[in-house]
């Protein structure tokens, strides 16, 4: 949801926060932090004070009453608690984008990476890139088939090696087909009005990782494109317990990740004309 601001913070950084190489035009495009770090720190403080992801909807937000009613109906549900990020989840990336409407109104949009305790969409936060109902339907149908293979494999005796190998091979093929079908639901756009499937956009010497296009930056940039907003700055920070690899710490800012974001952000930022090299 777009949250309008009365005025924009004076704090500003030209450092690139989100960037990537665009194979279509042969340039690296980037989006700076701008004033987004200020609003990210504000978000961090609000979450620490509230204790959950169900932040009150500020005045001036379109559809405020309906949105607030949705949040009120979820109040008290432990799945939205910030405690989740200090436990088994080992933290999560959150992001804020400063942007403006076509009429010049400046505001912010907030996002969380991936799922929050298996929840893809929380009122007040940027939705996922893919069509969520369609994604859930495809995933449920495909997972059912994969699970049926697993059940058959588990029921076989150890000496039935040839059949076991065949079923495992078929299960692996089904899993790959399901992932391909799910990836096909991710349609990415840029600021030239072009749209392409995720697999056509992604470029890297490494394979495409699970969760590509689910991080904060792609979510926020996609939301801006779908709602005709002009991004001015972006900031992503880590919330919660330090991750296992000790590369993320609570409250620290991090640029868009090299593995999943940079291979698609070049295309997504093409046409924005903040910085191109």
Language-model features and meaning:
Residues 1-277:
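Catalytic cores of nucleic-acid editing and processing enzymes
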